[in-house]
Amino acid sequence: MMLCACAFTAHAQGNTSQTTDIKKSKKMLVVFFSRTGENYAVGNIEKGNTHIIAKMIAKETGSKLFQIETVKPYPDEYKACVDVAKTEKENNARPEVKSDIAVEDYDVIFLGFPNWWGDMPMAVYTFIEKHDWNGKTVVPFCTHEGSGLSGTERKLKDVCKGSTISKGLAVRGTTAQNSLSQARQSVEKWLKSVLQSK
């Protein structure tokens, strides 16, 4: 089963579907988790799919960029990583992460991740649970190979207590790696939507 496989596709309700006026916000941050090594559909990669999209967003918005990294690296070999990710999800694990950044100091947080088993990697939950999200605007984005955002917008609404979850972006990993111009167009179009006034 693919890391990006999911059992369902769902659209977030309530605040998750609205665009938010974040032009007036003082500080924006792009936080992401990404993985290199052997990857589904694109082979061995030196820069992760989500990392590529995160850099585009940071450049377009002038945001600071922060990468979530685990203390224990995930296996480079694809199948081994799939197995680890599945076990972590089944156990609702919280892998230890290397470093941190105070999201409390920012108004808007773009949060990026690969779609693993229809969910965010468990390390993203580790990061989220370290922080107070009250009053923040969280803007999710993910890379995938067919599953899109799955139910992650709704899950973010549950775990980022007190925040507003804005319209998310899903980009195929193959597009991020092999069609940069297409990926950039998707990012730019999406940003125009989420940055506009309600």
Per-segment meaning from a language model:
Residues 11-106, 118, 185-198:
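N-terminal beta1-alpha1-beta2 submodule of the flavodoxin-like/Rossmannoid cofactor-binding fold
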Residues 77-164:
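Helix-loop-strand module that forms the ligand-binding subsite of alpha/beta enzymes
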Residues 1-14:
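Bacterial Sec-dependent N-terminal signal peptides
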Residues 62-64, 164-167:
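Conserved beta-strand segments of alpha/beta enzyme cores
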Residues 62-69, 100-105, 144-152, 173-180:
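Low-complexity, flexible helical/coil segments
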Residues 35-38, 70-75, 115-119, 144-149, ...:
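Solvent-exposed loop/turn segments at secondary-structure junctions
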Residues 32, 67, 140, 167-170:
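Structural signal for conserved beta-strand scaffold positions within catalytic alpha/beta enzyme cores
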Residues 165-198:
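A charged, well-structured terminal subsegment
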